[in-house]
């Protein structure tokens, strides 16, 4: 008892000693603390801030902390021997020193210093310890403060530590031998790193440590330190820092936790925003691995850093992550990309910044692919600067080349930025089909992706959830599901196997499409394994033809599983490469056989059987292996073979050799085979015998009796044929002749008509035998048996027209074979016809081919002539001069070209034109000599030809007395003195009845070309014009041929002559030049005018907007011609109408062209 009490006391004492040792140690804090060693009889305040020391900042990890600096100029030392200094710890929060003692052998470690440098000051070190993020090393950093007295001396630092398992039976203070020492790695900056390996299993235990520092020959030893490594973990910085704009328009900052951290972390996020309008900074602490920043603006820059620390309990902040910068675009779409399924509704948001100014959401419009403007009914104004567009019931996106999405553009009214949002719409309607095997042990599901659009980077996965019993009425996707591995098969389907299975559990499954833009699920389907059973095919399938009945009997055995009632389906058909199957259903679950009628008893039939649940659930099984019938004789042959004979021997003798010939029986006649043939003989002397000839089809015997009857029987495994043919050979009957005539008519090389005429007879005719052979060949005789009622027969065989054939007709009586009728050639008339027809075989195809060729040629010529007369040649009824004329009257053509009272609205065909210089002279005098030529006409007549260098002198128009105009002509100076390439010019006038004679006189003025008058052959051509004033027209040809003088012609004659002469001019330069044609006419007349087009070759109405009352000229044709020749400053109404070049097309679009592409010159 005393011993036990003593042991208990010792145990309590040891425990108290250990606890005391731990209590005397300094608990290391997660933040930095300081080791201070000071001289004796000095207060802590004096030590902390002596004379010549000041505060400075130093930091191991970036923070600035209070430190002591030493100024050597203000401090003096004296030599001291055996001076004891106290070392203690103090934290940043507590300025008082802790755990100091002056007894070397006492309760704490003290440092003894024999030096004169610590008379009035001590030494200081910053210490910070933590457990590395990988939880393997405990690290302590020791950093000497700036201006340390021994900073110029090399110093060494050692860390002594003891693990908890070594402290067994330890005294109050651990002995020196129980500590382990590690050497600390010191850098040139007086910063030392001490690494203590800590087992993972001891992270929650307490670790005792102390520091031993040697510097300048002085040894410093710190008091004990205690720490739990798990409370000093310093995680690694967060990884994968990234930023993105969310679907709600916020900036999402996200990152990943560092690995190997055994507890959750909290995070500190600091970010700054820099934009043209806002600059802000923020610092937030969150427990999640993401942070949302609202109020994002386009064209802004964000810089973010993150660090982590233990969420619950003590810990050390990690280092800051690498800064990450994110810049927003001028146009922000959120979300920037959307992946959705067919039939869904999605929305895009947009913020638009234009020239450092955010556009109002009311001014934003949306476009699809820059080709289709989205209706405003789909817009929503979220805020002043955020616009929203919604798409309803989307259709599948059709790929356009490499683009598999639709581009959605957010635009500032009519200005669109090049950035766009992407809309992916795919059809996720994937059909999943499942079947349970016949052993009810596994369920196989198959599905294909051929029906959906494949997106790059997408993966497909089948997911399912099993319910405890049956399926719900409406399957739905459960948030908790399991994936199933599926493998691609050679047929393009994916196949997944569920094994084991629960027959009555509902398996809800769907296909999940995983993509970086999101996930889509196909419509779910629920499968009950018991409802998709595919039974094993029926076994022991047999097929046979029943004897004497001829039915196809099929039998089978029902599979073991499932135990439900089954229905069966049979298919059968004639065996061959391609079997034409016939189907037969058996609904009686107890049936195991069935008999079916077949048309051919002697054919080989292939039979297969399959089964399915009779309640409609499940699937059809596979077809069983085919079973085949065996051809067997089911009955005796229906009849014997047809046969004929060949008689050889002297016709004068009584004995002849008769060879019987017959054709083998078909299967449908022999039912189903013939093993042998038997010939029965019966003679007139009542002699009867049989001969077995086996399978031969020829037999010869000797005919010696007056009458000899033979019968050929067919015998199979069941018996001999019942109905047989008899043939009697009789000498008397061989002389009976009832065939009067026999004729053969060849139709072609494969058919000959044989006809005959019979005479009356007392014998009963049974049938005929037709026999024929080629006389030029030693071939076998061919024969046919035909009915006795036939008088004409078509023989189908290969006949050569130049060969000779023998045809024989034998009448067969009951008493015997009659006398035959034999012919050796075809009928004479038909022979000649056939010989004539031989040439037709060559002539007729030639005639037919020639006729077809001639017909095709006529059709082509007809089309060309039709085009020539009806398309290339214009319809005269569409011409203006033909309006109101009746071409049905003969007198119309007599006066057609004599007189025209209406103005001509279209000129002759123009050749390649060139800018010209010309004058127009008047042949008829003015009534009023004082009147002047109208200004508009003068301006046209005085056109300056800048290109040719020719100037028309038109001053005479302002001074000449037009009463004397007949002897007056406008002169023109041509500097180049070369002949112009102008073919003609046109002047047309339709004066109103109220117009004065002076205006009409102008029309009769003479016309002079812009070249020397002495070289002009046309000077006097129009002096005595006899044209009507209402339809006067002048055609002025350039002086290309001096010998050609245009005579005075009527209008129609002049037009024809001009067209004839026009083709004689040489081709000119092909360079394109602007050309202008003017016609002078009244507005009233011109509005009803017509214009000739070069394509249609007909006259079409001249557009009213082309009247010079509202002058419109094509923009690319506006030139100095209009500026020089039209006095647009006058207010008088213009009476000129533009004559469009005939090389352009007059169409229904003329008005639109005039409105859109012509420059308005209206005064």
Curated annotation (Swiss-Prot):
It is found in: Cell membrane; Basolateral cell membrane. Glycans are attached at residues 23, 41, 56, 71, 79, 96, 114, 185, 204, 274, 345, 395, 431, 622, 657, 668, 686, 695, 726, 748. Residues 1-21 form the signal peptide. Keywords: Cell membrane, Disulfide bond, Glycoprotein, Membrane, Obesity, Phosphoprotein, Receptor, Repeat, Signal, Transmembrane, Transmembrane helix. Residues 22-837 are extracellular. GO terms for molecular function: cytokine binding; cytokine receptor activity; leptin receptor activity. A motif (Box 1 motif) lies at residues 869-877. InterPro entries: FN3_dom (IPR003961), FN3_sf (IPR036116), Hematopoietin_rcpt_Gp130_CS (IPR003529), Hempt_rcpt_S_F1_CS (IPR003531), Ig-like_fold (IPR013783), IgC2-like_lig-bd (IPR010457), LEP-R_IGD (IPR041182). Present as a mixture of monomers and dimers. The phosphorylated receptor binds a number of SH2 domain-containing proteins such as JAK2, STAT3, PTPN11, and SOCS3. Interaction with SOCS3 inhibits JAK/STAT signaling and MAPK cascade. Receptor for hormone LEP/leptin. On ligand binding, mediates LEP central and peripheral effects through the activation of different signaling pathways such as JAK2/STAT3 and MAPK cascade/FOS. In the hypothalamus, LEP acts as an appetite-regulating factor that induces a decrease in food intake and an increase in energy consumption by inducing anorexinogenic factors and suppressing orexigenic neuropeptides, also regulates bone mass and secretion of hypothalamo-pituitary-adrenal hormones. PANTHER family: CYTOKINE RECEPTOR, LEPTIN RECEPTOR. Belongs to the type I cytokine receptor family. Type 2 subfamily. This is Leptin receptor. The gene is LEPR.
């Amino acid at each position: 008892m005393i011993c036990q009490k003593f042991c208990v006391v010792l145990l309590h004492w040891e425990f108290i000693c250990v606890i005391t040792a731990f209590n005397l140690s300094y608990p290391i804090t997660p933040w930095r603390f300081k080791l201070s060693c000071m001289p004796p009889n000095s207060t802590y305040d004096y030590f902390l801030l002596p004379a010549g020391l000041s505060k400075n900042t130093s930091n191991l990890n970036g923070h600035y902390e209070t430190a002591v600096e030493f100024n050597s100029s203000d401090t003096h030392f004296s030599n001291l021997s055996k001076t004891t200094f106290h070392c203690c710890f103090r934290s940043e929060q507590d300025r008082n020193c802790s755990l100091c003692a002056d007894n070397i052998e006492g309760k704490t470690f003290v440092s003894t210093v024999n030096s004169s440098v610590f008379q009035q000051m001590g030494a200081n070190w910053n210490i910070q310890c933590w457990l590395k993020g990988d939880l393997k090393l405990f690290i302590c950093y020791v950093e000497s403060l700036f201006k340390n007295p021994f900073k110029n001396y090399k110093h060494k630092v050692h860390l002594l530590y003891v693990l908890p398992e070594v402290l067994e039976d330890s005294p109050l203070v651990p002995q020196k031998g129980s500590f382990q020492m590690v050497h600390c790695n010191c850098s040139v900056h007086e910063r030392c790193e001490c690494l203590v390996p800590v087992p993972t299993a001891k992270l929650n235990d307490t670790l005792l440590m102390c520091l031993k520092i040697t510097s300048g020959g002085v040894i410093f030893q710190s008091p004990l330190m205690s720490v739990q490594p798990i409370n000093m973990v310093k995680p690694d910085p967060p990884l994968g820092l990234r930023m993105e704009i969310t679907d709600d328009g916020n900036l999402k900052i996200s990152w990943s936790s560092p690995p190997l951290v055994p507890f959750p972390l909290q995070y500190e996020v600091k970010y700054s925003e820099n934009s043209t309008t806002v600059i802000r900074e923020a610092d937030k602490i969150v427990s999640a691995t993401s942070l949302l920043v609202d109020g994002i603006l386009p064209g802004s820059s964000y810089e973010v850093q993150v660090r982590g620390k233990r969420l619950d309990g003590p810990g050390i902040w990690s280092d800051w992550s690498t800064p990450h910068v994110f810049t927003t675009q001028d146009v922000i779409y959120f979300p920037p990309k959307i992946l959705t399924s067919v039939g869904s509704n999605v929305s895009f948001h947009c913020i638009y910044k234009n020239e450092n100014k955010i556009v109002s959401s009311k001014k934003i419009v949306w476009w699809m692919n820059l080709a289709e403007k989205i209706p405003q009914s789909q817009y929503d104004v979220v805020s002043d600067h955020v616009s929203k567009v919604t798409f309803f019931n989307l259709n599948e996106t059709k790929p356009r080349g490499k683009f598999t999405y639709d581009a959605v553009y957010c635009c500032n009214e009519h200005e669109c930025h090049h950035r766009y949002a992407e809309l992916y719409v795919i059809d996720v309607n994937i059909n999943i089909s499942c079947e349970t095997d016949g052993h009810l042990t596994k369920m196989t599901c198959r599905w294909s992706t051929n029906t959906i659009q494949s997106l790059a980077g997408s993966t497909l996965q089948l997911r399912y959830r099993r319910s405890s019993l049956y399926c719900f009425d409406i399957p739905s996707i459960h948030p908790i599901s399991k994936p199933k591995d599926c493998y691609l098969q050679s047929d393009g389907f994916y196949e997944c196997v569920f094994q084991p299975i629960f027959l009555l559990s509902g398996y809800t499954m769907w296909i999940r499409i995983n993509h970086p833009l999101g996930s889509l699920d196909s419509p779910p389907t629920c499968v009950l394994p018991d409802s998709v059973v595919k039974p094993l095919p029926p076994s022991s399938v047999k097929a046979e033809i029943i004897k004497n009945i001829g039915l196809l009997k099929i039998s089978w055995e029902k599979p073991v599983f499932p135990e439900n009632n089954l229905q069966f389906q049979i298919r059968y058909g004639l065996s061959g490469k391609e079997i034409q199957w016939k189907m037969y259903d058996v609904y009686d679950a107890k049936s195991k056989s069935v008999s079916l009628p077949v048309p051919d008893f002697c054919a080989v039939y292939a039979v297969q059987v399959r089964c399915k649940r009779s309640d409609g659930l499940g699937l059809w099984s596979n077809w069983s292996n085919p079973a085949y019938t065996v051809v067997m004789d089911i009955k005796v042959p229906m009849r014997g073979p047809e046969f004929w004979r060949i008689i050889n021997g002297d016709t004068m003798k009584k004995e002849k050799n008769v060879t019987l010939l017959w054709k083998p029986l078909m299967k449908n006649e022999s039912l189903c085979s013939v093993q042998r043939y038997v010939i029965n003989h019966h003679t007139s002397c009542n002699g009867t015998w049989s001969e077995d000839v086996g399978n031969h089809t020829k037999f010869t015997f000797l005919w010696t009796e007056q009458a000899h009857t033979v019968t050929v029987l067919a015998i199979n495994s069941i018996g001999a044929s019942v109905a047989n043919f008899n043939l009697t050979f009789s000498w008397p009957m061989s002389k009976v002749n009832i065939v009067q005539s026999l004729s053969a008519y060849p139709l072609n090389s494969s058919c000959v008509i044989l006809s005959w005429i019979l005479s009356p007879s007392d014998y009963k005719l049974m049938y005929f035998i037709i026999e024929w052979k080629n006389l030029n060949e030693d071939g076998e005789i061919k024969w046919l048996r035909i009915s006795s009622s036939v008088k004409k027969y078509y023989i189908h065989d290969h006949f050569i027209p130049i060969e000779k054939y023998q045809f024989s007709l034998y009448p067969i009586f009951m008493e015997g074979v009659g006398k035959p009728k034999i012919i050796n050639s075809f009928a004479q008339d038909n022979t000649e016809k056939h010989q004539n027809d031989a040439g037709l075989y060559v002539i007729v195809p030639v005639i037919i081919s020639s006729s077809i060729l001639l017909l095709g040629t006529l059709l082509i010529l007809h089309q060309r002539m039709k085009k020539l007369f009806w398309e290339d040649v214009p319809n005269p009824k569409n011409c203006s001069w033909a309006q109101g004329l009746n071409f049905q009257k003969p007198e119309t053509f007599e006066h057609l070209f004599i007189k025209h009272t209406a103005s001509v609205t279209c000129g002759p065909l123009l050749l390649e034109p060139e800018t010209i210089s010309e004058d127009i002279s008047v042949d008829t005098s003015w009534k009023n000599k004082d009147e002047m030529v109208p200004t508009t006409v003068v301006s046209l007549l005085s056109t300056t030809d800048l290109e040719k260098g020719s100037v028309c002198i038109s001053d005479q128009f302002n001074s000449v007395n037009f009463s004397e105009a007949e002897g007056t002509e406008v002169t023109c100076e041509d500097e180049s003195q070369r002949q112009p390439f102008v073919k003609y010019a046109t002047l047309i006038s339709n004066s109103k009845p109220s117009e004065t004679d002076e205006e009409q006189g102008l029309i009769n003025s003479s016309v002079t070309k812009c070249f020397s008058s002495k070289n002009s052959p046309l000077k006097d051509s129009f002096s005595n014009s006899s044209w009507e004033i209402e339809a006067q027209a002048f055609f002025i040809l350039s002086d290309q041929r001096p010998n050609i003088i245009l005579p005075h012609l009527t209008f129609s004659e002049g037009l024809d002559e001009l067209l004839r002469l026009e083709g004689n001019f040489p081709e000119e330069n092909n360079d394109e030049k602007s050309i202008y044609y003017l016609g002078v006419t009244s507005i009233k007349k011109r509005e009803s005018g017509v214009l000739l087009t070069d394509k249609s070759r007909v006259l079409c109405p001249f557009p009213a907007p082309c009247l010079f009352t509202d002058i419109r000229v094509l923009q690319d044709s506006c030139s100095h011609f209009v500026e020089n020749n039209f006095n647009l400053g006058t207010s008088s109404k213009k009476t000129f109408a533009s004559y469009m070049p005939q090389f352009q097309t007059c169409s229904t679009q003329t008005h639109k062209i005039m409105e859109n592409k012509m420059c308005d010159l209206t005064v």
